[in-house]
Amino acid sequence: MSSLPFVSDTFAADRWRQMDVDLTDMTFHRLISRGEVDGAPAGEDLPVTRIAFDRPSLRNAFRPHTVDELYRCLDIARCSPDVAAVILTANGPSPKDSGYSFCSGGDQRIRGAAGYQYETTQSSSDDDLATSARRERIEKGRLGRLHILEVQRLMRATPKPIIAAIPGWTTGGGHSLMVVADLAVASREHAQFKQVDANVGSFDAGYGLSLIHI
């Protein structure tokens, strides 16, 4: 815990209740009350949800399955009348190098001509497989997708503030998600920003960058 009163580290497990949603690439939590200081009985749900990328060994890169889970969590929060705000963040640090990241965009190892490819299995324990091994698991009969753009539209259509909490690297499609959020709060120590979509022949940033106010 932080040395400051009532200020947690990146994630204080005792402040959050895990939502009953089956996930492999994301985590989804509801903030719970500490008691009188929060104005509600201890343990009662507060109107804030935390949605986090959970692929830290891959700098929280997303694949189609990740995007499906992210969309589902955001939609649950959007449709829940007792949720007033959403924190979009990421878990970490990486077990490889102890580095922190928000999201590094799409997992290029499974990108094809039609978009990012679904895999036959979705276990998070296989994140460290080599590119050749990942390509062998691509679901051949299923179209690739680039539906992170659907997530961006959902974020803009949600009538509740979405706060991007940036614990580290945010690049490419991850950078676009940060821009599309209503507010971004970044770690002074670990946060770094980079837009690399053009380097991989993508224009995911087109929607997000149009929202920048200069």
Q: What is each of the regions a protein language model found here?
A:
Residues 2-96:
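Conserved CoA-thioester-binding segment of acyl-CoA-metabolizing enzymes
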Residues 15, 58, 90-150, 201:
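Glycine- (often His-adjacent) and acidic-residue-rich active-site loop
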Residues 208-209:
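Ligand-binding pocket scaffold of soluble enzyme catalytic domains
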Residues 88, 107, 177-179:
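Hydrophobic/aromatic residues within transmembrane alpha-helices
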Residues 143, 147-204:
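Glycine-rich beta-to-alpha active-site loop
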Residues 212-214:
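Conserved small/polar residues in nucleotide/adenosyl-binding loops
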